[in-house]
């Protein structure tokens, strides 16, 4: 549910940040990228697409976020620092919407409890499966990510 004027925080998803900047062309995307190679790729894509609505930062904390617009939506790739990142984002906007991406079943199964602990409700957990037909007309399964969503303050 991203609008053209939304402020979105994307953590560890360089291609998602670029897509979000295209969709929220009148808004702002705060891109947090820890990996240097991914950050360079994102910077190249920002230049290639002529995007001027992305602010790149290297971590999430109160200090790095203080001069940026307050996001209404956060998209995160699950990581060891995810709980701290979510808690920080909730301090900025207690009603923030979250979308978490993971390929790890255990992580997906644990997220509803983490969301409840942090006061995030309306939790939904879905898995997307994709199969591709190969040259021998057999279907090959692709990685099947879990998407976990929720909203703070409900």
Tell what function each PLM region has:
Residues 26-32, 98:
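Short beta-strand element of Class I
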Residues 13, 33-38, 78, 103:
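Short beta->alpha hinge that forms the Motif I/post-I loop of the SAM-binding pocket
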Residues 73, 135-154:
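Core SAM-dependent methyltransferase catalytic element
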